[in-house]
């Protein structure tokens, strides 16, 4: 009799735990969410549940529309053992003339949960991948490093890219920002479902690198973001970078229509209807027509300021105006850069041309006034050619003086790219948030060059010193294929410190943030910029006199 009662109590306990959303005790690979049951994969030291749809496929009549939550009910167990596919894209890092990758039906999330841990539940890191809003994918930022530490659940997100994600005519008919709206729906899915995987919905940290970092910032500028996440980190990208908020998108939208055979469209509604009828491959392949040379500009299609009457508009004001209004989510935020972030995309200037055998940077001596507005993203922000030429001349004089563009002067060209595309906006965004926000604002700079990074990949060269370029920090958190697996001892330490930093920030009960032995200093209420410097030798808090 006592045995029967004990068994009944045990069964009731299992039922209660299952109802509470915990991972099934009898089979941790079998997870139940509102759509039904799904089965993941055992990877030794972690479990993975990949390519779970969070939105209806954005195809057919749902192309160029606000994403719709995935409602299908599974009659059989969903197979979550296959890696996510890439959203269709024209990828910069593919050699050759055909850079097309991916498919249109791609709106999925993937969940990675540590195994063999003393914890039953984990804080959550949701990652928005980078790629200039044009390319990349959730699998681009590998999960092995984070899973090795066994301290957080990682969720990666696929979202629409390039023209499929960001074409816009600036009005309600074709408003744009579909990729950002995808991200937001995915974050809502995480909030509602992560407990079923052993995640803590009250401890969600949203992070992103480059365009992912800018996406994090843009998500944070919505007042309802605080309902989806506890804190946020933008690595080497924020909403104030000049390549983020696009101008001239209406003209590009109609030019896209002309390229794919919608040239007869005279209004946004007609253009949208025509574009919906065209093969996605044709639309994405048209990206090549918007590149001046190589992959420049690297973001021909990106976030837009939408019309207030657009359906479910994402942002209707410039980020600066949103911050000044104070109407954004008050969650702790960290923003970062690397000392030579401009190695992307300055490094491609060192690539030797097959026709002449000389580097592209040499051609800048004759093409600077033509190319600079595209390289540094002021082509659409200035009204006259004279304004552009005057600014181009000023930049060249400030960074090069009377020297010519050459391999020998590359370092100063890269410094220009770092300042204008990444570093300067960190200072401005921190300054604005400390003035008009209430929640903590943190910043750090990373200075520790990797052996192989974006500089070497884009230039195809190992004979040039690039410094600490774009991604050298984040690629110690999320492993990528082109970074050597045999990292230096200092990089192993930094990798662990970074991952612990994410865990600390997600779990923090007082909104503080720490890296190793260094506690970040809050910029809110400070007269000087508080910046944590991270190097191979450790970390140090610094004060910079750079606020206005």
Swiss-Prot record:
GO terms for cellular component: extracellular region. It is found in: Secreted. PROSITE patterns: CARBOXYLESTERASE_B_1, CARBOXYLESTERASE_B_2. Its main location: secreted. Coiled coil: none annotated. Changing residue 228 to V: In strain: GB4E, GB8E, GB115E, GB139E, GB336E, JR50E and JR198E. Changing residue 355 to T: In strain: GB139E. Pfam families: COesterase. The active site is at residue 210. Changing residue 330 to K: In strain: JR198E. Changing residue 487 to S: In strain: GB336E. Changing residue 15 to I: In strain: GB4E, GB8E, GB139E and GB336E. Changing residue 442 to F: In strain: JR341E. It comes from the Eukaryota. It catalyses: a carboxylic ester + H2O = an alcohol + a carboxylate + H(+). Its EC number is 3.1.1.1. Disulfide bonds join 87-106, 262-274, 518-539. Keywords: Disulfide bond, Glycoprotein, Hydrolase, Secreted, Serine esterase, Signal. The keyword Glycoprotein applies. GO terms for molecular function: carboxylesterase activity. Changing residue 269 to V: In strain: GB4E, GB8E, GB115E, GB139E, JR198E and JR341E. Glycans are attached at residues 95, 116, 479. Residues 1-21 form the signal peptide. Belongs to the type-B carboxylesterase/lipase family. This is Esterase-5A. The gene is Est-5A.
